[in-house]
Structures are given as structure tokens and as C-alpha cells.
Amino acid sequence: MAEQASEQQNITEKEKEQLPLTIKGLSESLGIPFVDCLIPCNFCGKFLDYLEACEFEVKKLSLIWKDYCVFACCRVCCGATATYEFNQFYQQTVLGRDIELAAGRSIFEIDIRCQTCLAFLDIIEKLDCCGRGLPFHRVRNAWKGICRQCKHFYNDW
């Protein structure tokens, strides 16, 4: 009996594609206010508070679906994940505008996340890093830089 229930919970790839990837999308599909969404962190199990849910959206992170259970990533675990990925999967570093040569694309077309908090860098943040000659790191085949919030941790404002 438990095996049948377990088999019924397995999610197919087609069904997975139809599930919402954002908290906003989830709240709309459930017909509930965004503020009422309680989503556990995939790593520590703590429920994201309202501010963390908003940060999750601003960072353009995607929800994680395991069977039909949804998970996100809290602020603390975003930082821990970023650090772990950097330490385990570092590939290369380039300075400033050299990222365009390394990636073979314009800075406007390159997706870059913050190496500290995983926020998605906007064009102003990317140009700021280029103009200051700050490092961009290739980690797990993705580019990392430093966002406007985290650069204050490095006393670089």
C-alpha cells in the first residue's frame, strides 16, 4: 500500500514543467496572497519569512520540486550554497571587461549571479564591476560577480 502511494507521488518531467518556478507564480496558481505562502528551505528546513520570500523573487531563484512538495532557499542557505559552490566548483577568474572575451558575448548578454548571496546582477552592477576592474569568477559553468548589497562587505563602495 505504501509503495503504491509512493509511486503515485513520483512526478513526471512533463508535470514538472507545468509547476510554477517562482513563489509569485505559486501563489497565483493556488489563488492565495503572496504573503501567505509558507515554503520550507531545501537545505535547513526553516520556513522562509516574508522578507526572505521577497528576496528569493528578487534574486530570480527557482523553486525546487521534489515529488509534489515545493522548497526554496533561505537567506542563510543562499550564502552557504554560494560559498560551497565557489570552494568546490571554481574554474577561473577574469578581471573587468575581460569577461566578454572569456564568455564570447557582450556583458549585456552574460548572466551573472552574486558570488556571495546568489542575487542576479543587473546591468548597472555588471558595468560597475567592469569599470572598477573587479573579478568575475566562473563557477560550475556560470559567472559570478559581486552585487551592490554584498560589495559593502568587502569595503568596496
UniProtKB/Swiss-Prot annotation:
The keyword Transmembrane helix does not apply. The keyword Plastid does not apply. A zinc finger (unnamed) spans 41-77, 114-150. One of its GO terms (biological process) is symbiont-mediated perturbation of host apoptosis. Keywords: Activator, DNA-binding, Early protein, Host cytoplasm, Host nucleus, Host-virus interaction, Inhibition of host innate immune response by virus, Metal-binding, Modulation of host cell apoptosis by virus, Transcription, Transcription regulation, Viral immunoevasion, Zinc, Zinc-finger. Plays a major role in the induction and maintenance of cellular transformation. E6 associates with host UBE3A/E6-AP ubiquitin-protein ligase and modulates its activity. Protects host keratinocytes from apoptosis by mediating the degradation of host BAK1. May also inhibit host immune response. This is Protein E6. HAMAP family: HPV_E6. Forms homodimers. Interacts with ubiquitin-protein ligase UBE3A/E6-AP; this interaction stimulates UBE3A ubiquitin activity. Interacts with host BAK1. Transmembrane segments: none annotated.
